[in-house]
Each structure stands twice: as structure tokens, then as C-alpha cells.
Amino acid sequence: MIFKVFYQEKMTEVPVRENTKVLYLEADSERDVRAKLKKFAYNIEFVQSVTGAHLEYEKQNADLKLTEIV
């Protein structure tokens, strides 16, 4: 499943909408997404699963590039 993750790069700063970044990640669950991103110390605001029509929309209208985490 593909997830869209909204996050701030620094955990110590107050989230500001204009600084929110997005990445796409393939994972089994939201818990798996958070576990994979834990080592980066991002301030994760929201994790959204992207499927069906939403996935097709993201492919057409956004820079949908899956982030690979080793």
C-alpha cells in the first residue's frame, strides 16, 4: 500500500503549514510507515493511505515519487 506522509523536517520546531513537506512511501500499515521514518526524527503531522481514484489522481497531478528507505 502507498502512503502519503505530511511532515516537518525538525521535531523541535512548531509545525508551520508553509514548511510542511510530503513524501510517498510503500508500507504495510501506518504503524510501519512511522517505524520506517522514526530514524529521521521527522515531526509527522499526518499519514494518509493512497488507493484507487485518489492514487490515480496523485499520479496525474503530483510528483508521486516513492521514497525508498533502507
From Swiss-Prot:
Catalyzed reactions per annotation: RNA(n) + a ribonucleoside 5'-triphosphate = RNA(n+1) + diphosphate
Keywords for the protein's UniProt record, in alphabetical order: DNA-directed RNA polymerase, Nucleotidyltransferase, Transcription, Transferase
GO biological process: DNA-templated transcription
EC numbers, comma separated: 2.7.7.6
MF (Gene Ontology): DNA binding; DNA-directed RNA polymerase activity
Family according to the record: Belongs to the RNA polymerase subunit epsilon family.
Function: A non-essential component of RNA polymerase (RNAP).
Protein name: DNA-directed RNA polymerase subunit epsilon
Gene: rpoY
